[in-house]
Amino acid sequence: MASRAGPRAAGTDGSDFQHRERVAMHYQMSVTLKYEIKKLIYVHLVIWLLLVAKMSVGHLRLLSHDQVAMPYQWEYPYLLSILPSLLGLLSFPRNNISYLVLSMISMGLFSIAPLIYGSMEMFPAAQQLYRHGKAYRFLFGFSAVSIMYLVLVLAVQVHAWQLYYSKKLLDSWFTSTQEKKHK
């Protein structure tokens, strides 16, 4: 764009946008955290579906007990762990703080608590396996307690990160609502 003062008018070279075109940090964080939580929810869904498949095969006796062991007691309440994830997903479209808080509280009850109970329930079998080398439950020829401890460790990590990101998202949403109230 040419002008009488010279080849280009001041401020029209495209470098004047930086002071105007900025997305507030809490909005950027909100988008990033929602994406991370969604990824963790999908990983949780895969773990949950594998657990449902294992329990279904065990209860419906599709395979012998030598191939797939009967479920441990902690696996039944852990099936409810899908509810906090669904509440979390429902909270995203309109930044619903109450759904996110409910999701975090129910995650402790339906996800973390059964995993803690599961680690205590399987500990004697794991101790016997590693001291004496004897396993009594199997999953496709492998020790069921070893495989289930791996699943348990993975699930604890997924839920811990999910809680961490949910707390950060909640803080981000509170920041944006506080700024709206001050205006």
Curated annotation (Swiss-Prot):
GO annotations of cellular component type: endoplasmic reticulum; endoplasmic reticulum membrane
Pfam families: Jagunal
Tissue: Ubiquitously expressed.
Principal subcellular localization: endoplasmic reticulum
Ranges in the topological domain labelled Cytoplasmic: 1-39, 93-96, 159-183
Swiss-Prot/TrEMBL keywords: Disease variant, Endoplasmic reticulum, Immunity, Membrane, Phosphoprotein, Protein transport, Transmembrane, Transmembrane helix, Transport
Lumenal side: 61-71, 118-137
Subcellular location: Endoplasmic reticulum membrane
Membrane-traversing stretches: 40-60, 72-92, 97-117, 138-158
InterPro entries tied to this protein: Jagunal
Keyword Hydrolase: no
Subunit-level organization: Interacts with COPA, COPB2 and COPG2.
General function of this protein: Endoplasmic reticulum transmembrane protein involved in vesicle-mediated transport, which is required for neutrophil function. Required for vesicle-mediated transport; it is however unclear whether it is involved in early secretory pathway or intracellular protein transport.
Matching PANTHER family: PROTEIN JAGUNAL HOMOLOG 1
Related illness: Neutropenia, severe congenital 6, autosomal recessive: A disorder of hematopoiesis characterized by maturation arrest of granulopoiesis at the level of promyelocytes with peripheral blood absolute neutrophil counts below 0.5 x 10(9)/l and early onset of severe bacterial infections.
Full protein name: Protein jagunal homolog 1
Gene this protein is translated from: JAGN1
